[in-house]
Curated annotation (Swiss-Prot):
Smr domain boundaries: 717-792
Gene Ontology biological process: mismatch repair; negative regulation of DNA recombination; rescue of stalled ribosome
CDD domains (UniProt xref): ABC_MutS2, ATP-synt_Fo_b
GO molecular function terms attached to this record: ATP binding; ATP hydrolysis activity; ATP-dependent DNA damage sensor activity; endonuclease activity; mismatched DNA binding; ribosomal large subunit binding; rRNA binding
Listed PANTHER family: OS10G0509000 PROTEIN, OS10G0509000 PROTEIN-RELATED
Record's protein name: Endonuclease MutS2
Assembly notes: Homodimer. Binds to stalled ribosomes, contacting rRNA.
Organism, as annotated: Ruminiclostridium cellulolyticum (strain ATCC 35319 / DSM 5812 / JCM 6584 / H10) (Clostridium cellulolyticum)
Similarity comment: family membership: Belongs to the DNA mismatch repair MutS family. MutS2 subfamily.
PROSITE patterns (UniProt xref): DNA_MISMATCH_REPAIR_2 (PS00486), SMR (PS50828)
Domain of life: Bacteria
Task of the protein: Endonuclease that is involved in the suppression of homologous recombination and thus may have a key role in the control of bacterial genetic diversity. Acts as a ribosome collision sensor, splitting the ribosome into its 2 subunits. Detects stalled/collided 70S ribosomes which it binds and splits by an ATP-hydrolysis driven conformational change. Acts upstream of the ribosome quality control system (RQC), a ribosome-associated complex that mediates the extraction of incompletely synthesized nascent chains from stalled ribosomes and their subsequent degradation. Probably generates substrates for RQC.
Matches recorded under Gene3D superfamilies: 3.30.1370.110, P-loop containing nucleotide triphosphate hydrolases
């Protein structure tokens, strides 16, 4: 592909736009090297990387390309062992920063499973934040090294500042001194040759001892360094030398650190240049609303709503174009400024862009072919608006084309055969087209010659096309109509402009019958095409309406299905909820029934216990009645307690058992008394307050009952082999009897074993009202195998 083809198709202007979208000189260099490729696989890869860049920008926004500078010369110096200056090191740090930011641009969570050219390139970048930060911390600008770049540099600069302050103090004291003030030209401290001086009047140079470093333009002022600060200025100069030495050492150290990662830096430069180039192509595609076309190498081109990228997008008319299936040569006819050349250039420029890895401004469904050669004869330096070139210029270009054309070539010929005798020009044009067609080239030509229309109609593999012209408005519509030959429209245009019918009819008489018939055929074809297009548009409208109705019905069907599914889901959820509630209610009912059964069982137990208690009380009362006769003679000696009240501790005389008064005596003289675990009704005559017991104890004979009970009971009980529940019942009965018998203490034998019985008994004994305390047995008593209980 030659430079002339690029120029006439204005591909260089596309490259200029692309160059303006790069972020670095490295990217611009790659743009300048960009040329259309002829290898199908290479083109496919280039398009893929551009399309991938578009996807990245659409998902993540513009990439962080700032800081990509050309440091290749600095890297060469490092490779040769050189030391970089502060500016070079800052630019190197900027490149490292750019690499780090680019690595952060790709977020694996967004497309961790997707292969990506951009992602692969970025993953190959090497960041070195340690070196980047070290350079940034040490170097403030191209002319300034930070004080904290090293401890030595910080110390040197501190000493310099101290010396400078000391010198200024001394010089200011001289300036302010009444002794020297009259010799001073101006009360300022200034510098000459990096040394602090003061301005002294010329006539008093001998009055202030020192070194003269400079004088004013008039000679009236001498800049003198007083001897008092000469040594301090010398010290500063020496410190400056040390400062520069330390700075050189710091720069050498940073350069050495950078040289250790030289291979990574060189690789980063190449990768970032490539990324800048890819993203520039992607930005161009986004700016022009481009798509990635499907590609082939068979010569087939299908362009859907293609827009020439160099025309104003507000006025450009999209074209629909196809070639390479039923025909490989297309002849476009029609009036000038009708859009023929624009169509020609659009096809050619799209092909160059696609084969350079650039996306094309068209709609989805566009397909482009990869050609080995692209030739264009559109006149020297011709732009879209320029006039045609001369016949000789055309022929020279065509000769060059014919010498190199093959079946993988795209040929673009504008106004083929123009600039000479129409008859000869038409004959030459047909011969050239026939030659190109026989060679298998894909050819697109524009012409004014009617003979070429006939050639296209009569030749297999060749097709007519035209650019539509609106006779009513006398303006072209710029629409490309493939399959329809163009008309000159001279008579129609003339009539619209006011030419009389007589002249127009007379002019038609000069035409041959063949021309008239041909024009009539074209008119008929155009009329039929127009009607067919209207019918097509109407059919398309009906189709779209049918599609819309179909879509509406499908949407309605989906909505109904979704609604049905939703209702079923709600019904299932409601049924599930009802089942859950029913199960919960059933569980609650079962629990309630169990609770009621338990309460009923407990009530039955309480009833039986109460019956037993009543039987016991009846037995006790019977016992009281049977003993009345033997007791009464002795009771007569006992006085009933006076002012008896609930809570008083009394002795039940006939039982010799202590108790607590619960109620006041009733009309029968009986009070309810708590004796151990039993509540019994006792006549007040059978009660005695405890504090009166000692005075009256000898007068009663009831002690015989307790003594008799104690004589019949054992002081210990063996519980070994019993279950805890069984042992608890036995112990309660035993302790009741022991308490009634007035025993002071008893021993429970439970054995050692696992200790479970002992632990359970101890827990139960804590709540027994008869017990004062309890403990495990001591040595000789049975130790852990027994529990000794002290009763109240």
């Amino acid at each position: 592909m030659n430079e002339k083809t690029h120029r006439v198709l204005e591909f260089d202007k596309i490259l200029d736009k692309l160059k303006g979208l790069t972020a670095s000189e490295l990217g611009r260099e790659l743009v300048l090297e960009l040329t259309p490729q002829t290898d199908y696989r290479v083109v496919e890869k280039m398009l893929s990387e551009t399309n991938d860049g578009v996807s990245c920008i659409m998902r993540r926004g513009s990439p962080p390309l700032g800081g990509i500078t050309d440091i290749r010369m600095s890297l060469k110096r490092l490779d040769m062992g050189g030391v970089l200056n502060p500016g070079e090191l800052l630019r190197l740090a900027g490149v490292l920063r750019a690499a780090r930011r680019l690595k952060g641009y790709i977020n694996d969570k967004l497309d961790e499973n997707n292969a990506s050219v951009v992602k692969e390139l970025i993953s190959c970048l090497e960041s070195n934040q340690r070196l980047e930060q070290k350079i940034d911390n040490c170097i403030l600008s191209e002319d300034e090294i930070a004080d904290n770049a090293s401890p030595a540099l910080s110390s040197i600069r501190r000493q310099i500042k101290e010396q400078q302050a000391s010198i200024k103090d001394k010089l200011n004291s001289i300036i302010r001194s009444t002794k020297y003030q009259k010799y001073i030209q101006e009360s300022v401290v200034t510098m000459r040759g990096d040394r602090y001086v003061i301005p002294v009047k010329q006539e008093h140079k001998g009055d202030i001892p020192g070194l003269v470093h400079d004088s004013s333009a008039s000679g009236a002022t001498l800049f003198i360094e007083p001897m008092a600060v000469v040594e301090a200025n010398n010290s500063i100069k020496q410190l400056r030398v040390k400062e520069q030495t330390e700075i050189d050492r710091i720069l050498a150290e940073l350069s050495q650190d950078a040289s250790l990662v030289l291979p990574q830096l060189n690789a980063n430069m190449s990768i970032m240049a490539r990324l800048d180039f890819i993203f520039a192509k992607s930005k161009l595609a986004i700016d022009y609303n481009c798509i990635c076309p499907k590609i082939n190498d068979t010569g087939k081109i299908i362009i859907k709503k293609g827009r020439h990228p160099l025309l104003d997008p507000k006025i450009v008319v999209p074209i629909d174009f196809w070639i390479g299936e039923k025909f490989s040569s297309l002849i476009v006819t029609g009036p000038n400024t009708g859009g023929k050349t624009v169509s020609l250039k659009t096809v050619g420029l799209f092909t160059l862009m696609m084969q350079s890895g650039l996306l094309v401004p068209a709609n989805d469904g566009t397909e482009m072919s990869v050609f080995e050669k692209i030739y264009a004869d559109i006149g020297d330096e011709q732009s879209i608006e320029q006039s045609l070139s001369t016949f000789s210029s055309h022929m020279k270009n065509i000769v060059d084309i014919l010498s190199g054309v093959n079946n993988k070539s795209l040929i673009l010929l504008d106004e083929l055969g123009a600039g000479t005798d129409p008859t000869e020009g038409a004959a030459l044009a047909m011969s050239i087209l026939e030659c190109l067609h026989q060679m298998g080239a894909t050819t697109l030509a524009t012409t004014h010659y009617s003979e070429l229309k006939v050639y296209a109609i009569s030749t297999t593999g060749v097709e007519n096309a035209s650019c539509e012209f609106d006779v009513e408005t006398l303006r072209p519509t710029y629409r490309l109509l493939i399959g329809v030959p163009g008309k000159s429209n001279a008579f129609a245009i003339s009539k619209r402009l006011g030419l009389t019918d007589d002249i127009i009819e007379r002019s038609k008489e000069f035409l041959s019958q063949e021309d008239i018939r041909f024009e009539d055929i074209l008119l008929s074809i155009e009329k039929n095409r127009s009607e067919a297009e209207k019918e097509k548009m109407r059919a398309e409208s009906y189709r779209q309406e049918a599609e819309r109705l179909k879509k509406d019905l499908e949407d309605q069907k989906r909505r109904l299905a979704a609604q049905k599914e939703s209702e079923l889901r709600k019904a299932r959820e409601e049924a599930r909820r009802i089942l859950t509630d029913s199960k919960r209610q059933a569980d609650e009912l079962v629990s309630e029934m169990k609770r009621l059964a338990k309460e009923q069982e407990e009530a039955e137990v309480r009833r039986q216990t109460e019956e037993l208690r009543q039987k016991l009380n009846k037995s006790i009362n019977n016992l009281d009645d049977s003993l009345v006769e033997s007791i009464m003679p002795r009771q007569g000696l006992v006085k009933p307690p006076k002012n008896l009240k609930p809570g008083d501790t009394v002795l039940i005389v006939n039982l010799n058992q202590k108790g607590t008064v619960l109620t006041l005596p009733d009309k029968n003289g009986e009070a309810q008394v708590q004796a151990g675990i039993m509540k019994i009704n006792v006549h007040i005559s059978n009660l005695k307050l405890v504090d009166e017991q000692k005075q009256q104890i000898q007068r009663t004979g009831m002690g015989k009952i307790g003594v008799s009970k104690a004589q019949n009971m054992s002081t210990e009980i063996d519980l070994r082999g019993m279950m805890l529940s069984e042992a608890v019942d036995v112990v309660d009965k035993y302790l009741d009897d022991a308490s009634i018998a007035g025993m002071g203490g008893v021993t429970l034998i439970h054995g050692k074993g696992t200790g479970a019985l002992r632990a359970g008994l101890h827990q139960h004994l804590k709540h027994n009202p008869h017990i004062k305390s309890f403990r495990l047995g001591k040595l000789g008593e049975g130790e852990n195998g027994v529990t000794v209980v002290e009763l109240k």
